[in-house]
Amino acid sequence: MKATEQHYSIKEAMLFSQRIAQLSKALWKSIEKDWQRWIKPFDLNINEHHILWIAYHFKGASISEIAKFGVMHVSTAFNFSKKLEEKGLLSFSKKQDDKRNTYIELTEKGEEVLMKLMETYDPTKNAVFNGALPLRELYGKFPEILEMMCIVRNIYGDDFMEIFERAFENIKEDFIEQDGKLVKRKPKTEEHEKELASQAN
C-alpha cells in the first residue's frame, strides 16, 4: 500500500471541511456577539480581553506567546497590548536573560478588571451555553467537544492545547461560586485565618 494513497473521496473531504466552516462561522457570530456584550461595560474589545486572559494565566507572557495562544498576528498582539498599557492594565518589561523578547504582565488594575469581568459573567446571556443546556439536561453534563479539541490540537500543536487546558484548570482552582457569581478564591492562609476566627467565636 502506498503512503500517499487516499482513504477518502474529494467529495467527502469537501463536505466535511465545509460543514465545519459553516458551523464555525455560525457559532462564531453568536460567540462574538455575546463576548462583546459581556466586555463592553469595561471598555475592552475581544482582542484586549483575550490578551488580559492569557497574561493572567501565564503570569507574564512574551508578545510572541500572546500572539500564538491568542491566535493573532504578532503586530496585533503588540498593538493591543500597548493600548492596554495606556489604560494601565498591563506593564511591559524585558528579562535580564532575554533582551530580545518583550514580556507583559497584568497590573493590579488589570487583574481587578479581569476579576470584575469574571464576577459579571451571566450564563443566561450566553447563546452557546443556552444552546448546550438541553444536552446537559439530557446527559447530565455539557458536551466535551473532544473531536473538536483533537482537530485544534492537530492544527495548533500540543503547546497550544496545554495552555488551553491550563487556563481552565486555573479557573477551577482560582475561583469559587459565591452568591451566583464567580469570585477569586482567597489565599489559603487568609481562608484558614477566617476558619480559625469563626471556630473561636
Swiss-Prot record:
GO biological process: negative regulation of DNA-templated transcription; response to stress; sporulation resulting in formation of a cellular spore
DNA-binding region in chain numbering: 63-86
Gene Ontology MF annotations: DNA binding; DNA-binding transcription factor activity
Cited SMART domains: HTH_MARR (SM00347)
Protein origin, superkingdom: Bacteria
Cross-referenced PROSITE patterns: HTH_MARR_1, HTH_MARR_2
Domain HTH marR-type: 13-157
Region (Disordered): 182-201
Keywords tagged on the record: DNA-binding, Repressor, Sporulation, Transcription, Transcription regulation
Family matches, as SUPFAM superfamilies: Winged helix' DNA-binding domain (SSF46785)
Protein purpose: Negative regulator of protease production and sporulation.
Subunit structure: Homodimer.
Protein name: HTH-type transcriptional regulator Hpr
Record organism: Geobacillus kaustophilus (strain HTA426)
Organism lineage string: Bacteria, Bacillati, Bacillota, Bacilli, Bacillales
Gene: hpr
